[in-house]
Amino acid sequence: MIDFGNFYSLIAKNHLSHWLETLPAQIANWQREQQHGLFKQWSNAVEFLPEIKPYRLDLLHSVTAESEEPLSTGQIKRIETLMRNLMPWRKGPFSLYGVNIDTEWRSDWKWDRVLPHLSDLTGRTILDVGCGSGYHMWRMIGAGAHLAVGIDPTQLFLCQFEAVRKLLGNDQRAHLLPLGIEQLPALKAFDTVFSMGVLYHRRSPLEHLWQLKDQLVNEGELVLETLVIDGDENTVLVPGDRYAQMRNVYFIPSALALKNWLKKCGFVDIRIVDVCVTTTEEQRRTEWMVTESLSDFLDPHDPSKTVEGYPAPKRAVLIARKP
């Protein structure tokens, strides 16, 4: 059973303590609910991983842990087998004692695009909404954050995060909670809030922006990354049944329309800091994610379009401030 007690003890002593009025009951309810059919297998994989404290830990340039002496072939094989039990691995990569987890997404590329535009993360308390396996949280810690809290209801991602955390020496500077943003009270407690790859999955995107704002302290910074299309401030794509084979894509605005949405929600100092087309080098099938990936979702005769005929995925990063 994954234990959240360390997180409760941690926030009991800081400005997130008021979260304890609701959080333990929510987590207890989650633990009582019907778990995914493979959850026991996943949590066992975490449990059977060895307790290792890294001799060298690099979270600034990557997520890399190394031991003072090389692990035996048997130890490496054990780690690799258990981590493969947690496939598919979508967000990464991770390099853990000679086991290189080549994930579907090169999330390090996204981080390299975002990082130069952020306010200094040193000492900050951060919320990462829809954090997946938690890759970016470890990079936030590497960039100096005091505490990174991720929320994502996907149970596999929770187990992937806990597996990586265990191999990083049970590092307590990052925590993942199996919750959605709609389950959080208006904490108004985070210096920086990240929402990357979430907005287009929300039926009400403006409500999502308000929810993000409710988590920020005054003068806090929002980092928003999402799918966009070309166009002016009035351009929004509402896909039909699917977009790039995804059923749960509701609104894809232009970057300028998204800027207006942020303004409408009361954000200020709104900047479009990056816009780029997603390539099949950044998102692709690997040995750690063996099912369909981006190349399967694009028109084989015209990769500038999805298989449904929409513009191929393009992503923008916007940064804004809560006054």
Swiss-Prot record:
This is tRNA U34 carboxymethyltransferase. Carboxy-S-adenosyl-L-methionine binds at residues 91, 105, 110, 130, 152-154, 181-182, 196, 200, 315. Keywords: Transferase, tRNA processing. CDD domains: AdoMet_MTases. GO terms for molecular function: transferase activity, transferring alkyl or aryl (other than methyl) groups. Catalyzes carboxymethyl transfer from carboxy-S-adenosyl-L-methionine (Cx-SAM) to 5-hydroxyuridine (ho5U) to form 5-carboxymethoxyuridine (cmo5U) at position 34 in tRNAs. The lineage of its organism: Bacteria, Pseudomonadati, Pseudomonadota, Gammaproteobacteria, Enterobacterales. It comes from Escherichia coli (strain 55989 / EAEC). The keyword Chloroplast does not apply.
